[in-house]
């Protein structure tokens, strides 16, 4: 790869030219990394619901043409000036949020919300010069959340790149770049269930299943899945879920159903849907005195919810989390090691694999609700 250092690389990328239209495989030019940046050769990427959301232009600022993708694994091709923690040949995971290492958030043991590199879905350019590193015949193509992994090569801020064990299979650990860590960490790092405890998981999509996996790893004995789609329950058993509640099948609030099932409430609840009603239910279903509810799902812009202050005064705790409270550069390598040691199971999240030329199939699988994670293999 060294003969490309400092040069423009021509490669294939899946370009979204307009909202909701199939991606088109195009030849793009990828500029070399500037100071503080890294150019990665992407080997495997996967589709996350966030990609679909912004591809459908439901986000704040639709930007097209754009190269989506933010869950991926690859190899460092070259680094820009001042980058010291990475070198060509390193195996790495790009992440939609970063760790500059210098801001108050990065210096705090409690936060992963870097001031400089926190997720920005509206920005389609690099921080350095407010320009794109992608172009087609001279026309700039927008970046997406600083990663744009639906390209054989991409340029990412060095603070958003985690160096990982080179023995880790990139076609498996690539899914740790977003959704799996978001759910897993919400349980392990934020809810912190004790062995033998009870945990309710609201929403059994990819993030909710990852939250359930976190409860399984933590040793929870009762893992209650809550979802409006009963067909999801069978699959969820693979992730440690051993009891199920469909709110539509009851004539009382689901928090009351769960409280009755658990002699007053669960020890922990993790909400992974973004639904206001689910947030209220998750908080109100935890036991007084010690119960902790964690919000993961992203609500709509103008949403608000109310609950009685006595729920707090009775010693219930409500927390929020972002990317599972993991610092990307510091913590992600350790999550990869959890997988390498057999503590974390990733294979069960991967339901489909497609070649890069058939990337639109991944969108079809997700839109039909058929996939948890679809791996897109860049080299064919």
From Swiss-Prot:
Cofactor(s) in the UniProt record: Zn(2+)
Signal peptide, first to last residue: none
InterPro entries (alphabetical): ADH-like_C (IPR013149), ADH-like_N (IPR013154), ADH_Zn_CS (IPR002328), GroES-like_sf (IPR011032), NAD(P)-bd_dom_sf (IPR036291)
Enzyme class: oxidoreductase
Residue sites binding Zn(2+) 2 per the record: 100, 103, 106, 114
Keyword set includes Oxidoreductase: yes
Residue numbers binding Zn(2+) 1: 48, 50, 70, 178
Cofactor note (record): Binds 2 Zn(2+) ions per subunit.
Binding residue positions for NAD(+): 50, 203-208, 227, 232, 273, 296-298, 373
GO cellular component: cytosol
GO molecular function: alcohol dehydrogenase (NAD+) activity; S-(hydroxymethyl)glutathione dehydrogenase [NAD(P)+] activity; zinc ion binding
Tagged with keyword S-adenosyl-L-methionine: no
One BP term from GO: formaldehyde catabolic process
Entry keywords, A to Z: Cytoplasm, Metal-binding, NAD, Oxidoreductase, Zinc
Residues bound to an alcohol: 50, 70
Subcellular location: Cytoplasm
Annotated transmembrane regions: none
Family according to the record: Belongs to the zinc-containing alcohol dehydrogenase family.
Alphabetized PANTHER family for the sequence: ALCOHOL DEHYDROGENASE (PTHR43880), ALCOHOL DEHYDROGENASE CLASS-P (PTHR43880:SF26)
Protein name: Alcohol dehydrogenase 1
Annotated source species: Pisum sativum
Lineage: Eukaryota, Viridiplantae, Streptophyta, Embryophyta, Tracheophyta
